[in-house]
Regions:
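Amide-donor transfer/coupling interface in amidating biosynthetic enzymes
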Residues: 1-9, 14, 113-189
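N-terminal beta1-alpha1 cap of cysteine-dependent amidohydrolase-like domains
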Residues: 1-70, 74, 97, 113-121, ...
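Short coil/turn connectors at secondary-structure junctions
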Residues: 4-5, 44-45, 78-79, 102-104, ...
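Generic hydrophobic alpha-helical scaffold/packing signal
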Residues: 24, 59, 69-76, 93, ...
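General beta-strand structural signal in soluble alpha/beta enzymes
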Residues: 31-33, 84-85, 178
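Catalytic nucleophile loop
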Residues: 50-52, 73-97, 106, 181
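Acidic, Ser/Thr-rich peripheral helices and adjacent loops at domain boundaries
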Residues: 103-111, 116
């Protein structure tokens, strides 16, 4: 039997704070790190989990920790598995644009995010989707938007009434990402 690897989870008080205890418990061995201040160790990591939060409120701290952003990009480029939800997905993008400027992020995903006031649009509600024949549920809550092209979704996402919504869940390299916060981690990671 193969060695069980640990899950590395980004967590702090605001920029990566949308975590469900049931999700954390489902991982087995976990290690937490703060992308604003820590340098993560990827030794024996089987999955990097970047949950949601408000990275757009802490951009200067995230940009200042360049070694963390580079380590995450290197991990992704070397085939490391990543699951990123909302703020975590934003952190993996090329940049986040605000009214104060453009801030480089990890550069793993080939997209940029706008958090500009002029681009604000509330996306809110319960979501459900199918991945590899299994239904997953979650919620969506954000004001930010993709700049330019939106990723092509690998499955249709629905609201609580069963109506299709435009929120993509997508893959890039070994990354599974979406604005949707899922209540359980997909088996297909």
């Amino acid at each position: 039997m193969g060695e069980v690897k640990r899950t590395l989870i980004a967590r702090n008080s605001e920029s990566f704070s949308f975590l469900y205890q049931e999700v954390i418990d489902s991982f087995g061995e976990v290690t937490f790190f703060d992308p604003e201040t820590d340098f993560p160790s990827f030794d024996d990591v089987g999955l990097l989990y970047l949950p949601g939060g408000y990275p757009e409120k802490h951009l200067e701290a995230l940009v200042a920790n360049e070694s963390c952003r580079k380590a995450i990009k290197d991990y992704a480029e070397q085939g490391g598995r990543i699951f990123a939800e909302c703020g975590g997905m934003m952190y993996l993008c090329q940049s986040i644009k605000t009214d104060d400027g453009e801030y480089p992020m990890c550069g793993v995903l080939p997209y940029s995010i706008s958090a500009r006031k002029a681009d604000r649009k509330l996306s809110l509600g319960y979501r459900r989707l199918m991945l590899d024949g299994k239904e997953y549920r979650g919620h969506e809550f954000h004001y930010t938007q993709f700049v330019g092209d939106t990723p092509k979704s690998i499955t249709q996402v629905y609201n609580a009434k069963g109506e299709p919504v435009a929120t993509p869940i997508f893959r890039h390299m070994n990354v599974l990402a979406s604005y949707t916060h899922l209540y359980q981690i997909p088996d297909c990671l």
